[in-house]
Regions:
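Carbohydrate-binding surfaces of carbohydrate-active enzymes
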Residues: 1-315
C-alpha cells in the first residue's frame, strides 16, 4: 500500500534510509513498467497496424531508438538497425558550424556506434556542404553493414541513472549498457558467449556496484582481459577511437574497422587488430591526416582494403 509512504514521493524520508530507498525504487520501477506497457507497447502496436514505424527515445519497443549511448546499447541488444541520432544541432552560434569544425564530432559519434544521422531541416546548410554530406553517407554505408563487435555488457540498474556515464572500459574494448529487461532475457545456455535476442554476443558481463565494478575479482585493475582469453579488439595510440562491424558472408567473415584521429595533427600510427579469434593479430601501419579517418577492411581470405573516405570524395 503506497498511501502510508506518499511523503516519500515528495522526498521526505520515512522509517529508515534503506526503507526510503526501497520505496523510491519501487515507485520508479512501477512508473517505468507502466510507461513501457501502457504507452510505448500500445503506441507501437497501433503504429504497426497502420504500417508506420516508430522513432523516439531509447525504449526497446521502437523501430529506431533515438538517443546517444543508451540508444546504441539498446539497438545492439535488441537488434534494432540502424542506430540513429540527431547530430550537428545546437542553440548557440550564428551559422558558424563549418563542416571542418563538425567533422571531428561526427567521427566521434560514428566511432561510438551511431550509423544513421538525423539533421534538422532548417539548421544545416545542405547545399553548401555537399562534400561533408557525401562523407557521412559513405561512412554510414560501411557502418550499417553486419553487426557491431562489442565484448562487454555492463548491467546498469535503472535506479542509478546518473552512473551511466561513469563507466570506462579498458582501451581496445567496446561495451553496451544492459538494463534488467535485457539481463533477464540473456540466454547463458544457448552459447558459451552471452547471446541476446538480437544475436549480439558479449564475452564479459560487468555488474556495477555503488563504488566499484565487479569482474571476477574486485576491483579489476588489469589493463585488459587477456588473462581470460579475450585480447583487445584493437590496439591504437592515445587520442584515437574506432568502430568495428562484423559481416558474415557466404565466402566467410569480413571485419570492417573505422579508425579516427582525434588530434589536430598528422600522425603515423601502427594499429593491431584482433580478427577471427582473439589470438590472431593483424598489424597495419597507417598515415592519418589531422582529424582524419580511415576504414580498414579485413577478410578471412587474407584480403585487406584501406579506404580513406575523405580522399575518395576529393574532386
Amino acid at each position: 500500500d503506497l498511501i502510508p509512504y506518499l511523503p516519500v514521493m515528495a522526498g521526505v524520508p520515512l522509517e529508515s534510509a534503506s526503507r526510503y530507498e526501497q520505496v523510491q525504487n519501487d515507485i520508479r520501477l512501477t512508473i517505468e513498467e507502466l510507461v513501457k506497457e501502457k504507452f510505448f507497447q500500445t503506441f507501437t502496436r497501433l503504429a504497426e497496424e497502420q504500417y508506420v514505424e516508430v522513432s523516439c527515445a531509447p525504449i526497446p519497443r521502437t523501430d529506431h531508438p533515438d538517443d546517444m549511448f543508451r540508444a546504441m546499447s539498446i539497438a545492439h541488444i535488441y537488434n534494432e538497425h540502424p542506430v540513429q541520432a540527431a547530430v550537428c544541432t545546437g542553440n548557440s552560434g550564428a551559422w558558424n558550424g563549418l563542416p571542418a569544425l563538425l567533422k571531428p564530432l561526427v567521427d566521434r559519434h560514428l566511432a561510438l556506434g551511431i550509423n544513421r544521422f538525423i539533421f534538422q531541416h532548417d539548421i544545416v546548410r545542405h547545399l553548401e556542404a555537399r562534400g561533408f554530406m557525401d562523407y557521412i553517407t559513405m561512412c554510414q554505408h560501411y557502418l550499417q553493414q553486419g553487426r557491431p563487435v562489442v565484448d562487454i555488457a555492463v548491467f546498469h540498474p535503472s535506479e542509478n541513472p546518473e552512473q551511466k556515464n561513469s563507466y570506462r572500459a579498458p582501451r581496445g574494448y567496446k561495451y553496451d549498457l544492459m538494463n534488467k529487461d535485457a539481463l533477464l532475457k540473456w540466454n547463458f545456455e544457448y552459447s558459451p558467449k552471452g547471446k541476446l535476442p538480437g544475436n549480439q554476443d558479449y564475452r564479459i558481463l560487468v555488474v556495477s556496484q555503488p563504488d566499484s565494478i565487479v569482474i571476477i575479482d574486485k576491483p579489476y585493475q588489469a589493463k585488459n582481459f587477456s588473462q581470460y582469453g579475450i585480447d583487445p579488439d584493437v590496439i591504437l595510440p592515445e587520442n584515437m577511437d574506432y568502430a568495428h562491424r562484423l559481416v558474415l558472408e557466404a565466402t566467410g567473415r569480413k571485419d570492417i574497422y573505422f579508425l579516427i584521429n582525434q588530434e589536430n595533427k598528422e600522425r603515423q600510427i601502427t594499429a593491431t587488430f584482433r580478427t577471427g579469434t582473439s589470438r590472431i593479430r593483424q598489424i597495419v601501419n597507417l598515415n592519418l591526416p589531422a582529424y582524419g579517418s580511415v576504414f580498414v577492411i579485413l577478410s578471412n581470405r587474407d584480403d585487406m582494403q584501406i579506404i580513406s573516405p575523405a580522399k575518395l570524395l576529393l574532386p
